[in-house]
Amino acid sequence: MPHVSAPVIEKLCCGVNVDSYGRNKLHNLIINSPIAEHPAGIKELVDKGINVNAQDINGWSALHFAVQEQSYTAVKALLENGADTDLLESNGNSALHKAVFYSNNNNDIISLLLVYGANPDTVNNHGVTPRSLAQVVENSSIVALFNKCNIIG
């Protein structure tokens, strides 16, 4: 596992707990650092007491950002450190909604979220579920994955 440079962690651990967007140090690690540093940085920040499930002013958790970045290693590290797959951002989207939208036919993150209990039938503010979104974007492999997991809507 790559080591996060001391200056990166020092910068993340100094100063205010959240920025003007309501993002904590974990959000900013995911957004601003190289993907290779995510797992070690996540572990170190969580060990220092950073809330893995904190949400910014738009309701995004670090997990939402990791999914958007398509960082499997960050998603895995967040889930291993207690990230909640059911947190909804301001539009009612879960991390699984984001994973379906950003998947680009790579279903590894979707599979991982399902293993950690993500619900493909969570309805967002527009009445859309991850399952229905997979059908709309015509990603039959995700639809098959949901069905293979025997998750019935």
Q: Model segments located where?
A:
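Conserved ankyrin/ankyrin-like repeat signature
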Residues: 41, 73-74, 108-109, 141-142
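Intrinsically disordered, low-complexity regulatory segments in ankyrin-centric signaling systems
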Residues: 1-48, 57, 151-153
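Ankyrin repeat domain, specifically the short helix-to-loop turn at the C-terminus of the second helix
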Residues: 10-14, 43-51, 76-84, 111-119, ...
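Ankyrin repeat boundary signal
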Residues: 17-18, 52-55, 85-88, 120-123
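Ankyrin-repeat and related helical/solenoid repeat scaffolds used for protein-protein interactions
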Residues: 88-126
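Ankyrin-repeat-protein effector appendages
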Residues: 2-17, 116, 125-128, 133-153
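Ankyrin repeat A-helix N-terminal signature
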Residues: 28-37, 65-71, 98-106, 133-138
